Amino acid sequence: MPNEPTLVFVPGSWHRPTCYDTLIELIEPKLKCVAVSLPTTAGNPEATFKDDVDAAQELISVETRSGRDVVVIAHSYGGIVGSSAIKGFAKSKNGSDSEGGHVIGLILIASGYNLTGVAFMDPFFGHPPPSWRVNKETGYADIVTPPREFFYHDLPQSEAEYRVSQLTTQSLKALFEGREYSYAGWRDVPSWYIGTVEDRGLPVLAQRMSVGMAREMGASVEHRELQTSHSPFLSQPALTAKIIFEAVAAFMDSDNGKSIFQSQETENSAIIRPGLALFQPLTWFKFGIPMAFGRLLGRGILLYSWVRRLWSRGSR
């Protein structure tokens, strides 16, 4: 089996796989990279969340069948796609694995930790945020906020304008339907989370809450943050690549992985490691409070799940 895993990149809503090109150019000399083209961003309002998951699983399957392990890297909406696509590809806990490769890790970028059986918009009770609206006539989600402000406010104007020109349509069906195909794959593999402090699309406080929730629910989460917009793979590709190399080395859990991937020359001081410092009260508010809320949410979800299982057994 090849030693190095393949990276499978999943883009977010409205984005083509080419949004990762700059980042992939930095990574490909050391790791094989493939990017998923989401059917729900291909101009078909009938495309579904299941179609996106199937597209991601198809690429994962190609790699694992050839004996390669896989690390899934997903941005924004792509997080629920990437996490769901892990189903059936992680190593089994009882050791009865089939031959071939497996998904060995998940890296989320400005995204969230989804729940099994919960559609993308379910946590928002079906109400879209002010940044986009439901267009029932076309079947697409229409961006209302100026896209540069939403995604790329820290890019030079010319590059931001180009990136805006590359945005495409987003099927509503993927956002509101398909909950039966949503799967919390992040509970099956270790994960890394790359947060975005200056994000105007997904507030960093919400990101920190999501990390706290996942940890409370038993997930293994390494957390890093960058002082960027919603798209760090464009505004800070070298730092994003640095974190990815560090994560892959951890997923491989070997000296070989560390020697290959941790020698990247980048400025580590720009990478934030969120955590509490006893004599730095600001960290209590920046990190402690939102993560504590997340942990309470995670505990509530676990309690609800436990009561639901108990009720189901009692009603049989």
Question: Whereabouts are the PLM-identified features?
Answer:
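Helix-rich cap/lid subdomain of alpha/beta-hydrolase
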Residues: G112-G185
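Active-site catalytic motif of lipid deacylating hydrolases and related acyltransferases
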Residues: P2-R68
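Conserved serine/cysteine hydrolase catalytic core
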Residues: S171-F233
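Flexible "cap/lid" loop of the alpha/beta hydrolase fold
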Residues: K91-T138, I143, R208-M209, G257-G275, ...
